[in-house]
Amino acid sequence: ALDEGEDMISNDVVLRIIGPYGGFGLYEPSINGILSSCSGWATSARDCVKNSGEIPILSRISKYVHPNVAEMADYSAVVGGAVQCSTNLGARISNTTSFDTMSGSLSMLFGYAVSAAKA
């Protein structure tokens, strides 16, 4: 099996579960979903890091995923090389700091970005 953050090559074993299928088969779809989503997020972050040169990559993925998986998406992005993430829990489990930006809709509500920032 692979260690966390290690590059995957086609046909690599990424997780090995030993035991009767009846003991874990019920969880197979969830395990597959977690592995495929997390590896996809980490791979995307790694691609960004490789192509960014010296520019640090910050993960804002929490804006685009369901809130129940936002911290795992952030954690996966940090595993892939992002230096910060946008959820407090994602930052805690990845031992980084969180950051965020002001919502564009907040600026629209106030009519002007400076007014929204002051609020």
List where the protein language model places each region:
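Buried, small/hydrophobic-residue-enriched core segments of structured protein domains
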Residues: E4-M8, L15-A119
